[in-house]
Amino acid sequence: LGAGNGIIHAFEQSSSERALNSIRIFPGWTSKPYAGLKEGRRVRLENNDLEATEKYFPDYVISAGATVRQSNVNVSFGQEYVNISLMGVHPNYTEVETVKTADGRFVNQNDLKERRKVIVIHKKTADILFGKTHTEPIGQFVNASGVAYQVVGIYNDQGDREASEAYIPFSTLQTI
């Protein structure tokens, strides 16, 4: 009984940053040959797979989104900089992951559609970049690997999520 409760507690703790009614699907490799094709072929996920998921499974899928990550990105404002990962996300990312916007807003549908160069940064990142100059981050432009992004939101998670992530529109990161 004690071990069972421990496992349940560990699962609840590890999933506290994620909606319990969500799943993640990752690309991979085939394990069996099929129709004359060899095993070990790479399975790629494309944008139309996301659209098809919502279209063909409306009774089971409330919403679908995708993420893409670009790691080790230097983000700077003036002389200050941090090294973070840019996460390209859909607006519904906050329905699945517990990212709480403390100031400003999160990525929205217009940002995604228009491939806007907007960014949502962690409060710790904002403190590093803007703290010395006492500049209000919302509306300012930061440089991320030579691309200027306008800060539209600040998030402040208390969970295990790293402060080393910033969020931009999925479509924007795909085009860079």
Regions found by a protein language model. Name each.
Residues L1-A3:
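A hydrophobic alpha-helix feature that marks transmembrane segments and, especially
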Residues M87, N92-V107, D111, R115-I176:
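Mid-to-C-terminal secondary-structure elements
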Residues N5-S85, N92-E95, D127-I128, T175:
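Hydrophobic, regular-secondary-structure patches
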